[in-house]
């Protein structure tokens, strides 16, 4: 039982790290490019030349539009799912995967390995019922 608890806690920690990495990746865009600012070393065109928007503006607009769409997707998904439920779902999934992988090697080598795997699966099912979660990965 202690091993199962430690395995579950490791899965929760892994899910938290994964969630934090995913959120930091979406905010890693260059702020100067999103704001549409130009580089300070660029030459200023004279008054005789026609005023045309630089190409970096269109790139910045595309980048900011993509960032807005990405932010909207993240916001809508967060509104739909409670973040705690999402973390619990991920940790249960990781626990089930770890138990499945452990079960492949334990059945023949360790006495009581099959019972350990069955108890771990029952534990994951109890958690699903306790938090009233559906299995989205099944």
UniProtKB/Swiss-Prot annotation:
PANTHER family: DERMCIDIN-RELATED, EXTRACELLULAR GLYCOPROTEIN LACRITIN
InterPro entries registered for this protein in UniProt: Dermcidin/Lacritin (IPR043557)
GO CC term (a single one): secretory granule
Region (Disordered): 20-79
Domain of life: Eukaryota
Molecular function, one GO term: laminin-1 binding
Entry comment describing in which tissues the protein is expressed: Expressed in secretory granules of many acinar cells in lacrimal gland and in scattered acinar cells of salivary glands.
Signal sequence, start to end: 1-19
Localisation per UniProt entry: Secreted
Name under which the protein is recorded: Extracellular glycoprotein lacritin
Role played: Modulates secretion by lacrimal acinar cells.
Keywords, sorted A to Z: Glycoprotein, Secreted, Signal
Glycoprotein found in the keyword field: yes
Glycosylated residue positions: 119
Biased composition (Low complexity): 43-67
Gene Ontology BP, a term: positive regulation of epithelial cell proliferation involved in wound healing
